[in-house]
Amino acid sequence: MKNEKRKTGIEPKVFFPPLIIVGILCWLTVRDLDAANVVINAVFSYVTNVWGWAFEWYMVVMLFGWFWLVFGPYAKKRLGNEPPEFSTASWIFMMFASCTSAAVLFWGSIEIYYYISTPPFGLEPNSTGAKELGLAYSLFHWGPLPWATYSFLSVAFAYFFFVRKMEVIRPSSTLVPLVGEKHAKGLFGTIVDNFYLVALIFAMGTSLGLATPLVTECMQWLFGIPHTLQLDAIIITCWIILNAICVACGLQKGVRIASDVRSYLSFLMLGWVFIVSGASFIMNYFTDSVGMLLMYLPRMLFYTDPIAKGGFPQGWTVFYWAWWVIYAIQMSIFLARISRGRTVRELCFGMVMGLTASTWILWTVLGSNTLLLMDKNIINIPNLIEQYGVARAIIETWAALPLSTATMWGFFILCFIATVTLVNACSYTLAMSTCREVRDGEEPPLLVRIGWSILVGIIGIVLLALGGLKPIQTAIIAGGCPLFFVNIMVTLSFIKDAKQNWKD
């Protein structure tokens, strides 16, 4: 019995270092918010200006890797001997569900405003050219390119899961073919896992930092409760308590049902916006934007703006590539686990087509609605952001739709459920990654899950206290730097092992 407890307890070497590092950073930030903002700006400037090119080349190289998988020697290889666990329709729906987080709702509604007001390529702000390119850049940042990079890593993890029959709960487990078992299970592997966990904690904290203001702004609109930092903290605390109750009382089935409700409600809300906002304009704008994307794609791929130094690629493209990098392992593990029995080509094509369709629908519908409201002078986004913050501006893009009360209730429920499932997923992923061998069908310890959800909540509150988008962007970019190298090592390890062990 004692031995069993030891196995399912925490793994000290990957539990305490991330906890201590993140705790110290949060304490230093809260101690002096002004000084923290100075450091944040310096870190953001250094990483994006000095190393931004590396993120851009990483995405391009991974895209070529996708083509190699689809048309190369492993294209027809099957990931496991069993038939696919899910039907193709269910498989694609599960992919779509993974895209409907509150953070996605945040960016989908407001991103186009930033692209139009501070456009790339030296275009005039709010000009016709800026508007024509606005949605095209969203389709670039949330389109086939990043999903192609995820599909490569998903194939790698699916190979380790279903072909090599490895238990992978941390990235170091996949590095045995590359660095050897001694190093993968030793200090080197521990460092890799700690980099992964620290980055993942900050990524989840930033997602919570984006999601919470949407819920509190909805509460202000619906109930007249003023949006304050204290209310944000109370809401995050309520989510943590709700998550603890769900875990303690065995209500995980309820959480899964909530996740399904989130997906169906997302379809309903997007359909409503599409119909009442202007279906004809949305389809025309999308079609034109695809053409703009194809025309400007080479420039977008390698745009670093070293001469004019306008800051657009650093503030957006590098930021988003770091965002994709930081979530790559967690997301790829999930996508790999639902893809058992599929061929490499099927997984690569299914992910790129299915997930691109999901994100393109979200960004096209929400972005087009925002542009229409701006052009018709129904809402003044710059004034809303200056006076009340970004979250209020997003809420107003929904409140401006017909049947505003019903629409706002739908959006409120969607954001609330999305964040509940986010907190649950955060605590589960971190607990699984910091515990000793939790077997299939078992749950990580309750206190560990609650502890991680509290820490993620604290990070969300700290980022909200700092104010603005820059702290959130910096947290993502800083976390993406070490995972940039971890993702490359996982990729190389897969290529090396497959070459030796995945033959006809």
From Swiss-Prot:
InterPro entries xrefs: BCCT_CS (IPR018093), BCCT_transptr (IPR000060), BCCT_transptr_CaiT (IPR023449)
Topology of this chain in the membrane: Multi-pass membrane protein
Subcellular location: Cell inner membrane
One Pfam family in the UniProt entry: BCCT
Gene Ontology CC entries for this record: plasma membrane
Main location: membrane
Regions that span the bilayer: 10-30, 51-71, 92-112, 143-163, 195-215, 231-251, 263-283, 316-336, 347-367, 398-418, 446-466, 475-495
Domain of life according to the entry: Bacteria
Pathway where this protein functions: Amine and polyamine metabolism; carnitine metabolism
Transport keyword on record: yes
Keyword Ribonucleoprotein: no
One of the GO BP terms on file: 4-(trimethylammonio)butanoate transport
An example molecular function term from Gene Ontology annotations: (R)-carnitine:4-(trimethylammonio)butanoate antiporter activity
Quaternary structure annotation from Swiss-Prot or TrEMBL: Homotrimer.
Listed NCBIfam families: bcct, PRK03356.1
Function according to Swiss-Prot or TrEMBL: Catalyzes the exchange of L-carnitine for gamma-butyrobetaine.
Family classification: Belongs to the BCCT transporter (TC 2.A.15) family. CaiT subfamily.
Protein name: L-carnitine/gamma-butyrobetaine antiporter
Gene: caiT
